[in-house]
Amino acid sequence: MSRRDVVLTNVTVVQLRRDRCPCPCPCPCPCPCPVIRPPPPKLEDPPPTVEEQPPPPPPPPPPPPPPPPPPPPQIEPDKFEEAPPPPPPPPPPPPPPPPPLQKPARELTVGINGFGRIGRLVLRVCMEKGIRVVAVNDPFIDPEYMVYMFKYDSTHGRYKGNVEHKNGQLVVDNLEINTYQCKDPKEIPWSSIGNPYVVECTGVYLSIEAASAHISSGARRVVVTAPSPDAPMFVMGVNEKDYNPGSMTIVSNASCTTNCLAPLAKVIHENFGIVEGLMTTVHSYTATQKTVDGPSKKDWRGGRGAHQNIIPSSTGAAKAVGKVIPELKGKLTGMAFRVPTPNVSVVDLTCRLAKPASYSAITEAVKAAAKGPLAGILAYTEDQVVSTDFNGNPHSSIFDAKAGIALNDNFVKLVAWYDNEYGYSNRVVDLLRYMFSREK
């Protein structure tokens, strides 16, 4: 290479260096910075021929430094795979065996058909005893009138709780009770409200066939609050243990008078034996009687004014005792006097005894039963009482020791009081609870 070529080559190199100016100025043009030209190399041997090449492209920008690696997770020494696993904890002691599964008890729910004297008092007693009433049916009473009739009672006083109606329901102490106005029991939707036990209080559907309409519409059981011509009859404290839940869906709670007489007759017969007897009930007037004289084709005397007269009447209460105490079948009969009092009646049982006994021995036997097996059903008093003293008494029968008399040790007259409304309604509810207990 000639000296001229060497010079040209150096010029080219200098030009390339100027293109890559080391100064910090951002301009791409040749900058005014002074160029330091290196001295020409010493030529010992002629350099090889160098062909002129285009300037190389600028080097790519260096890649951004990689992000620092995340710090290794802080692992407990015993979590390293290399570390041996800790010994397993000892197994816990076996749990105690679970209690045997019990079928949950179905709650006793009650429906009432007929919101008359007994229907309303059955509702009161259910509220007092914590039994849930789910429905009341009465074709002649709407919910607003039900509130009035239940809240105010001329005989038993005003209901002490809260009573109102809301959305077509009767609400008693915040308990919502469905109300219906169905004339036919088959139309009452018992099945849609939990298949309750139904209390038949109308006095109309007394036979098994008639009361079966409630079963057809979903009632679980039916208790008729009157003597029935063919349904099994039960008096609490006397024969309720004969109830058979497998075959008896419709039963009768007998009459209020039978509920008074039967417990007393049971005690006397078991202790002394009853050869025969006559019963008279002096009975308060009821809703079937007339306030003033009126027509009564089947019972002419019964059509006379209830407030003005003592009215002789028939009753099947004494004969019904033979149904609940079979040993007394055919040994008792009786009659009634309807008198001008609104509530509380009294039974006079005059009987001949098989086993001679003094009157004091008889009273002691009744007193022992009232404190023992018949507690809550039969009561005993020696006080000088009158009828109004028993208004609101929940017992079926209250024996009046001072009112009875004996002709001799085999012939006696025994007296027992009863609230023919409230006492009877308590036994209706007791029978419902007993029947329900037999289903468990």
Swiss-Prot record:
In this protein, the active site sits at C256 (nucleophile)
Ranges where the record places region Disordered:
40-106
Q: Which Pfam families match?
A: Gp_dh_C, Gp_dh_N
Note down the stretches annotated as region Testis-specific N-terminal extension: 1-105
Please name the top-level EC class of this enzyme. oxidoreductase
Binding residues annotated for NAD(+), in chain numbering: R117, I118, D138, K183, Y205, T225, N420
Binding-site positions, D-glyceraldehyde 3-phosphate: S255, C256, T257, T286, T315, G316, R338
- Show the InterPro entries listed in the entry: GlycerAld/Erythrose_P_DH (IPR020831), GlycerAld_3-P_DH_AS (IPR020830), GlycerAld_3-P_DH_cat (IPR020829), GlycerAld_3-P_DH_NAD(P)-bd (IPR020828), Glyceraldehyde-3-P_DH_1 (IPR006424), NAD(P)-bd_dom_sf (IPR036291)
| Localization per record | Cytoplasm
Q: Please state the Enzyme Commission number of this protein.
A: 1.2.1.12
Can you state which reaction this protein catalyses? Answer: D-glyceraldehyde 3-phosphate + phosphate + NAD(+) = (2R)-3-phospho-glyceroyl phosphate + NADH + H(+)
Record function comment: May play an important role in regulating the switch between different pathways for energy production during spermiogenesis and in the spermatozoon. Required for sperm motility and male fertility.
PANTHER family associated with the record: GLYCERALDEHYDE 3-PHOSPHATE DEHYDROGENASE, GLYCERALDEHYDE-3-PHOSPHATE DEHYDROGENASE, TESTIS-SPECIFIC
UniProt name for this protein: Glyceraldehyde-3-phosphate dehydrogenase, testis-specific
The organism named in the record is Mus musculus
